[in-house]
């Protein structure tokens, strides 16, 4: 099985452990990231997500398909970027309400999955779009990627 996919058993276990509340997502298409190494803004973008949730406690993860995690925190305390393994950002949380913030370098899609970037050959303008199918949202931002973990979303786009 592709490592980014979760099994039915994993989804059932996480449904019993996590209740997702909200996501604040900033998609930065500008190519300007303060205090970070340069990257190719025609191929990649920076995604920053703050996920708010409650948990019964224990090890858990957010799903994210990204080139790499730039920074992550749990309730304001740093998480190691080494916790990002097989498209999952792992963390351990006690029972209660929590907040994970993760910034990542994500890759534009050329297939319509995740965030698609297209340069129109007629007007030479850049267009971005997404359908954010459940399984493809994780290509643009960190989330608890399964349909039964519903939450509200607030998006900010920097272009």
Q: How would you label these PLM feature ranges?
A:
Residues 1-159:
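Acidic/His-enriched low-complexity segments
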